[in-house]
Amino acid sequence: MPPGLRLFAIPGLPEIRKGEDLAERIAAAARTEGLSFEGGDVLVVAQKIVSKAEGRVVSLVTVKPSAKAQELAAHLKKDSRAIEVVLQESRRILRSDRVLITETHHGFVCANAGVDHSNVPGDDMVTLLPRDPDRSAELLAAALHRKTGKRIAIIISDTFGRPWRLGLTSVAIGASRLPVLRDLRGTRDREGKPLTATILAAADELAAAAGLLMGKSEGTPAVIIRGYRFKPASEKAASIIRPADEDLFR
């Protein structure tokens, strides 16, 4: 068989709650679908279920908006309580014209600091990003190794917008046990010309591929990618974030 990738969606996960064994839930759902893990698989998991398992869910009923949150909410015509949560999850505000773009404590630049109303029960509930997505990925990789005996790489994905293109795409916000970047500098193209600047965001590309099977309403928060060739590595998704001193727009 020629080399290629195969992707397997893992549907049927129940609503995840704080403290649940996410590795067991995923493994059980895979078994129900007749799927088993193999060494070298990459498991892409939606951020939302990781956040729920870690208790990163906030009831807006408990939030008291600050004066700054109320000011921004009036300007943006948003719930001031949700804006307050965004401010608490942010290092700084980058834009507040039509949407609130912030830099999170992780260093991500995204809308609303990743605070999200979707796919969480209740009108006044929001989810937050995991505190340390790379650590979350490593803990999940270790737990699945114990349960399956297989060494599986993990990517935690979330959907981000892009400044100059329409539409959302899935990116890696956490990773474990695989290279997140493919540095091709120093190699040559097919014409023998040296590559001097090419670094591929491999983890983001894998997250985007899995995102085609996840969707927003399909109830498929986990996807197995099989056939991707890589050497195990201890790189973190945090290393994909461009340093501020190299960023022309921040």
Where does each model-flagged region fall?
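N-terminal and secondary-structure boundary signal
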Residues: M1-R250
